[in-house]
């Protein structure tokens, strides 16, 4: 591993996106099935800086989604509304085929997706390895320019239909973070200056 690469945070991350790329599948027996994109290489602003999910071959481990993937509502582990039938990587995006359950809670969300009221999609994922890229520098493969943290190895573990999306490049996509509110960098810079003046 190069000096620029570090073992990433062990905490769980989420990204939400909004797009018109959630599509109902056609044909008999597919009434509750949709295809969607759930992640891309679109830069995403975290409170610590810009994060980019690498979608190169081998960067994304889709094993867990393909084996036991679930469809949630707003990342709520108690709101399982369906299952992931298959997930795949294509054209620097992750896609999935999902199927909604038929219980009462799932039916409400299914109808809202079907009618176009809900268009937001989000992915919950864990990071294995990142490459830190300083401002004006490029990644080792020349693909991305800093400042950014490029997530080189990561694995998604759930897909969510979300109410409030933040990234408009995928869909049903990315959503506004519930836990990590985005604070402008100026706030942190001011706090650093205050701390320097009081020490």
Where are the regions that the model predicts?
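Terminal short linear interaction segments
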Residues: 180-199
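Signature of dsDNA virion morphogenesis modules
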Residues: 1-184
């Amino acid at each position: 591993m190069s000096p620029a690469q570090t073992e990433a945070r062990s905490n769980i991350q989420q990204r939400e996106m909004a797009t018109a790329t959630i599509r109902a599948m056609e044909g008999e027996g597919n009434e509750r099935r949709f295809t969607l994109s759930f992640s891309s290489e679109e830069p995403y602003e975290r409170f610590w800086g810009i994060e980019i999910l690498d979608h190169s071959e081998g960067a994304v481990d889709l094993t867990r989604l393909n084996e036991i993937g679930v469809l949630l509502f707003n990342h709520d582990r108690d709101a399982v509304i369906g299952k992931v039938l298959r997930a795949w990587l294509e054209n620097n995006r992750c896609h999935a085929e999902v199927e909604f359950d038929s219980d009462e809670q799932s039916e409400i969300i299914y109808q809202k997706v079907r009618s176009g009221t809900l268009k937001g999609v989000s992915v919950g994922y864990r990071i294995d390895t990142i490459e830190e890229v300083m401002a004006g520098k490029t990644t080792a493969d020349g693909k991305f320019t800093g400042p950014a943290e490029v997530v080189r190895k990561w694995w998604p573990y759930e897909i969510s239909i979300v109410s409030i999306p933040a990234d408009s490049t995928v869909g049903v996509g990315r959503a506004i973070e519930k836990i990590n509110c985005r604070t402008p960098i100026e706030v942190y810079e001011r706090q650093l200056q205050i701390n320097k003046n009081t020490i």
